[in-house]
Amino acid sequence: MTTDINGTALAVFIFFFVLVTVMGFVASRWRKPETLAHIDEWGLGGRNFGTWITWFLVGGDFYTAYTVIAVPALVYTVGAYGFFALPYTIVVYPFVFMVMPVLWKRAKDFGYVTAGDVVHGQYGSRGLELAVAATGVIATMPYIALQLVGMTAVLKALGLHGELPLAIAFIVLALYTYSAGLRAPALIAFVKDIMIYIVVIAAVALIPSKLGGYANVFASADAAFQAKGSGNLLLGGNQYVAYATLALGSALAAFMYPHTLTGIFASNSGKTIRKNAIMLPAYTLLLGLLALLGYMGHAANLKLDSANDVVPTLFKTLFSGWFSGFAFAAIAIGALVPAAVMSIGAANLFTRNFWKAYVDPDVSDAGEAKVAKITSLVVKVGALLVIIFLPTQFALDLQLLGGIWILQTLPALVFGLYTNWFRAPGLLAGWFVGFGGGTFLVWDAGWKPLHLISLGGEPFTVYTGLLALAANIAVAVVVNALLPAKAPVRA
């Protein structure tokens, strides 16, 4: 289970992990309500998070441990194309500023907890509600599993191998999430985000000085790409359209996920959400700096088993033991916060849009909270089992599909905020075409999220999620136009 352990790094790592564990259990008494036996309190923190709590929570939830590992890994592998995450996390915030306060008000006014609640309230359709809820759950499961991939990379760099350390970390996470609900990741997010800022700023300031400066970093990366015949410091060929459509599609999908919507619904006002849409791009700046670590991996001449090892190996090689332990703790804690919120978001969906809708319509508030707590445990265990017993590539493929799938819920969730013209049968038909068609196109392309199309005789590579969304909307419009008019049902 252990090899090549740096005692100082491990001690620092354990200290911060224990610190956030204590904070997780203390969180049940932070901003304590009369009772946590209500899904509004356990699953949404009482809908009372202000600007700063929301900023740390959404930032900690959106910019995950896997982001810290995967973005530099992608840049290390393909170069400039890996920077698509920057425009994606810029374009998303005007969308958040305009749409999310409207969605928050709808949820607040009618007591909705999930996207499925909003859809059922707008259209009165259990079928459409179930489609949206099921999509949210299955898109979230691999996302949680990938947080474990990020944590595994860190544990490996610490010299801890095997499943036991990972299982212990997730058991601890499960226990304090069960106890405190959304308050636990909200409180821990303060520590996680501050630690990540310190690590990334220190890395981009100190590491280049040890590698001959940024000129040498870029020159080394360019030489590495030229030597292997793939990747580049600049976009080329037909990458521009692929880059732009991937960024746009990812931006539209980002706040359709249950975990990001949970952060929105937990806010105390639409004004808080708008302030966060203005402030959250600070994390995008951090992400841009983080991506540069991929180029630094080439300058450091790292020998890697996997591109996902570039950040942990870089820190282990170039930082002192105590700071590498601090950095590894920041990344590991960066897995705990989003994993907790994701499991809560998935649990809320199951409880409200399956259990209450089909199993026990008269379930009490306390019963709802109990079902959500148990479901959150099951979700975490499921994600852990995926990583332990299935190839990591399985989780990666599912996550790739998850982004395309969750994007297909946008018409049902967002269009009804602005117009009553659309109706459930059309939206459900559109969802089915987008979901099925997007899945087929990804499979047909060899499990790649990009598809080659021809316009005016010119070939373009386009993000499959946007193609599926276009088909989704087109089908919804056509079917809706053929249906007799019917007033919306909002309850």
UniProtKB/Swiss-Prot annotation:
Its main location: membrane. Induction: Transcriptionally regulated by the two-component regulatory system MctS/MctR. GO terms for molecular function: transmembrane transporter activity. GO terms for biological process: amino acid transport. CDD domains: SLC5sbd. It is a multi-pass membrane protein. It is found in: Cell membrane. Keywords: Amino-acid transport, Cell membrane, Membrane, Plasmid, Transmembrane, Transmembrane helix, Transport. It holds the Pfam family SSF. Gene3D superfamilies: Sodium/glucose cotransporter. GO terms for cellular component: plasma membrane. InterPro entries: Na/Glc_symporter_sf, Na/solute_symporter, Sodium:Solute_Symporter. The chain crosses the membrane at residues 7-27, 55-75, 83-103, 130-150, 157-177, 187-207, 246-266, 277-297, 322-342, 374-396, 400-422, 427-447, 465-485. Signal peptide: none annotated. The keyword Secreted does not apply. Inhibited by CCCP, but is apparently not affected by the concentration of sodium. Belongs to the sodium:solute symporter (SSF) (TC 2.A.21) family. Low-affinity transporter of alanine and high-affinity transporter of lactate and pyruvate. Can also transport other monocarboxylates such as propionate, butyrate, alpha-hydroxybutyrate or acetate. May be proton coupled. Required for optimal growth on alanine or pyruvate and ammonia. This is Monocarboxylate transport permease protein. The gene is mctP.
